């Protein structure tokens, strides 16, 4: 306790020094605490389910591609799922689920609900029970059952928390569903950017109103997500081997649909964070670099401070203080500084987390759970003590070995620095330069990558377009002709609104992150279904390309005459033509998109036009081959409406709701937002990477510059008498300035050389995050080297200016 009080008293006597060290620590610790808070919530915090480590996601991939599947859960057909469930001996249970939005029409206005159709086994598999009511029963997956489970938020918002709602019927999509339970407040599954508000069983998928074959009977129609719970003590490798055997048997048994399917098991948490994982790892590494720069900077400051205290420490040693006592005293001081930096860093991180959450892409799971918890506090405390100890260890050890004779005889200054001390401080400066260069290069590469991504032409003009989704209840609009008639009336009403230039409808809009792909056949060269190529398919109305300002480069656009009674037609993208009709005129070619949503045998469609490529998923990836079909010939109940108008999107959204209500008040309008938001969202992750790494690089650059300035300033102070002698012997001011600057820039050059090696080592980490630029781009490397060199030169030049103004008489007076 006495050592603690003495250390605290010593630090309080030097508030400027203590404040600089605490601020330096706080910048590094704050950056790491903020990043760790995200990693803790997204990746490390256990999922809120029973034995979450036993939960796995099952992903399918095309074996023809020869690559592993992405780690986010892909889809499976219901017949394949049934076979997996029956034949495996490694899972305790399995379940599937799929997004199934519903419309609640019991209130004054139709309300869109984010819903999921799930296996009855899902909730027991997750180990979560409703807070009131019961879970789904196994037989409620069968056709004819209409039961629903409410989320806690929907229960409170729509039903006022009335416990009597359990057992009552509500109207969803024009049908009566019995509410059987309410889930806990913190429960959400699947975990994502659109949390479910209501769950129904698979029974709603296993029957159709028009008598067509339901999707759940079509092997090869992969639309369900699949998870499973491993049996106790079952290694995932053994489960993988068992499922590989089953999948191989299915490939032989069903060659038309399963011939090329492979299957991969992933831990559920791994699958959930797959998209965010590379960026989070990179941010963690960059934040660690900032902390290391700060640590080295503080070590340099403590080393200089210990040298100025050599006389004090020598007196202590002469009076009987042992080396351990001196080391302990100095380590306590550095630990206190680290603790102060930790508290300030935690405050910085808390302030910055709200801004960080606003910048994070919405597709990153569990964003709302990001907050400092006990794990974050423990991490901050550990890092604070660790950096305090690391920064103070070498200075403390060096200070505990004083030369008593020199220290006690020196009455003019605390002590002169040894050659070993100068080398140590030089090494610290080199390390700071290396880390600063690595961070600067990373920030420049990510920034250039982001700029190039923004320059990608998406194939459409998003300005002044408002989008919204309209979902028609299947009970009211069971037939395609009814859906087509509704959309036709709606667009006719919308196009007459003031300020509206054009309007259209589509299955999916560009850069929404969603797609539908169909196998298709070319009439002139038919192939077995397992060998048929795949293309993105979109269902659009005749003004779709006009509204997007996309260009029909060959042939014609769709017209109102392309209705259900007209010959079946299609428009394809330029990429489609390049891949499947190279050197040929595609107009008049006949293709057959094998879409399961189309009743009966899929019709042959004649290609009547070619449109420019449109980025449907992301700007980063090249557009896939695309097929467009007229909505009148392939009418669907859920469409996105696009309205080109210079009015505020809020006004357009309100006018669109009024137009829908004029036709049918039980049809909801939701997700009203500008198309430009989707474009911005598609580059949210690269933008975040560039911003955060740029901020970290700026901090590291300032700390490195401060380190160079501090070392050179201290060197000038230590060499004052030497400089005075040089002046006395005839040296000019320019000579002294060149001496000091060259000494500092020599360290910078060494740091840059090692920094390039560090940049090349980071190539693998950065490459997956870059677009249109290599991780070792020489122009970028040269640019950041020049920037770092100029700032380091200024940091050397300022002490050199002070050295050139030394008065030789004053400098030599003590000699």
What would you call each of these model-derived segments?
Residues 38, 299, 335-407, 448, ...:
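Small-residue-rich transmembrane alpha-helices
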Residues 1-20, 109-112, 141-144, 217-224, ...:
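Membrane-helix entry/capping segments
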């Amino acid at each position: 306790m006495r050592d603690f009080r003495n250390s605290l008293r010593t630090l309080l006597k030097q508030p400027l020094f203590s404040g600089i060290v605490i601020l330096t620590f706080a910048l590094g610790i704050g950056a790491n605490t903020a990043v760790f808070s995200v990693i803790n919530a997204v990746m490390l915090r256990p999922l809120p389910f029973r034995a979450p480590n036993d939960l796995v996601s099952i992903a399918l991939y095309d074996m023809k591609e020869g690559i592993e599947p992405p780690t986010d859960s892909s889809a499976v057909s219901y017949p394949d799922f049934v076979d997996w469930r029956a034949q495996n001996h490694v899972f305790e249970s399995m379940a599937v689920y799929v997004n199934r939005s519903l419309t609640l029409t019991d209130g004054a206005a139709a309300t869109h609900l984010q819903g999921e159709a799930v296996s009855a086994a899902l909730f027991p598999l997750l180990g979560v029970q409703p807070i009131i009511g019961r879970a789904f029963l196994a037989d409620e997956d069968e056709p004819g059952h209409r039961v629903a489970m409410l989320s806690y938020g929907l229960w409170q918002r729509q039903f006022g928390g009335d416990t009597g709602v359990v057992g009552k019927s509500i109207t969803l999509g024009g049908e009566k569903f019995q509410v059987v339970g309410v889930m806990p407040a913190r429960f959400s599954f699947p975990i994502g950017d659109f949390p479910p508000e209501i769950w129904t069983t698979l029974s709603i998928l296993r029957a159709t109103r028009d008598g067509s074959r339901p999707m759940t009977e079509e092997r090869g129609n992969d639309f369900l997500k699949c998870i499973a719970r491993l049996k106790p003590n079952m290694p995932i490798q053994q489960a993988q081997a068992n499922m590989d055997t089953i999948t191989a048997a299915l490939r032989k048994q069903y060659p038309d649909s399963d011939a090329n399917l492979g299957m991969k098991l992933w831990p559920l948490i791994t699958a959930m964070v797959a998209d965010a994982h590379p960026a989070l790892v990179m941010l963690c590494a960059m934040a660690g670099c900032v902390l290391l720069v700060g640590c080295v900077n503080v070590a340099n400051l403590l080393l200089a401070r210990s040298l100025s205290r050599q006389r004090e420490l020598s007196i202590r040693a002469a009076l009987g203080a042992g080396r351990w006592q001196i080391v302990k005293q100095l380590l306590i001081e550095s630990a206190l500084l680290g603790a102060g930096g930790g508290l300030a860093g935690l405050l910085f991180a808390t302030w910055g987390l709200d801004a960080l959450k606003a910048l994070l892409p919405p597709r990153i799971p569990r964003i709302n759970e990001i907050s400092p918890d006990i794990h974050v506090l423990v991490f901050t405390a550990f890092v604070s003590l660790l950096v305090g100890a690391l920064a103070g260890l070498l200075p403390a050890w060096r200070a505990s070995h004083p030369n008593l004779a020199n220290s006690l005889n020196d009455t003019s200054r605390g002590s002169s620095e040894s050659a070993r001390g100068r080398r140590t401080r030089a090494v610290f400066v080199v390390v700071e330069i290396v880390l600063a260069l690595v961070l600067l290069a990373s920030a420049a590469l990510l920034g250039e990558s982001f700029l190039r991504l923004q320059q990608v032409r998406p194939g459409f003009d998003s300005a002044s377009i408002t989008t919204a989704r309209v979902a028609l209840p299947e009970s009211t609009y069971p037939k395609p002709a009814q859906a087509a008639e509704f959309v036709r009336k709606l667009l006719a009403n919308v196009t007459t609104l003031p300020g509206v230039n054009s309007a259209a409808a589509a299955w999916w809009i560009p850069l929404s992150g969603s797609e539908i792909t169909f196998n298709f056949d070319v009439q002139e060269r038919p192939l077995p279904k397992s060998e048929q190529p795949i293309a993105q398919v979109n269902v659009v109305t005749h003004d779709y390309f006009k509204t997007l300002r996309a260009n029909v480069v060959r042939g014609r656009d769709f017209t109102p005459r392309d209705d259900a009674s007209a010959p079946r037609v299609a428009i394809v993208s330029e990429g489609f033509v390049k891949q499947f009709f190279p050197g040929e005129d595609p107009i008049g070619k006949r293709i057959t998109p094998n879409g399961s949503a189309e009743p009966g045998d899929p019709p042959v469609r004649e290609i009547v036009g070619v449109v420019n490529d449109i980025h449907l998923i992301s700007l980063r990836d090249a557009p896939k081959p695309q097929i467009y079909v007229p909505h009148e010939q392939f009418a669907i109940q859920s469409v996105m409406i696009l309205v080109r108008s210079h009015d505020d999107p809020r006004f357009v959204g309100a006018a669109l709701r009024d137009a829908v209500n004029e036709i049918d008040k039980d049809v909801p309008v939701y997700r009203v937002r500008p198309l430009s938001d989707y474009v911005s969202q598609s580059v949210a992750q690269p933008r975040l990477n560039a911003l955060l790494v740029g901020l970290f690089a700026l901090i590291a650059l300032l700390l490195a510059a401060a380190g160079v300035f501090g070392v050179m300033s201290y060197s000038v102070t230590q060499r004052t008498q030497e400089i005075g002698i040089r002046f006395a012997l005839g040296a000019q001011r320019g000579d002294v300035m060149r001496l000091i600057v060259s000494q500092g820039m020599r360290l910078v050059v060494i740091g840059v050389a090692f920094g390039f090696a560090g940049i090349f080592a980071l190539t693998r980490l950065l490459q997956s995050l870059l677009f249109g630029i290599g991780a070792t781009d020489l122009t970028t490397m040269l640019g950041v080297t020049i920037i770092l060199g100029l700032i380091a030169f200024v940091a050397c030049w300022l002490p050199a200016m002070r050295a050139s103004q030394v008065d030789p008489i004053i400098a030599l007076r003590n000699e």
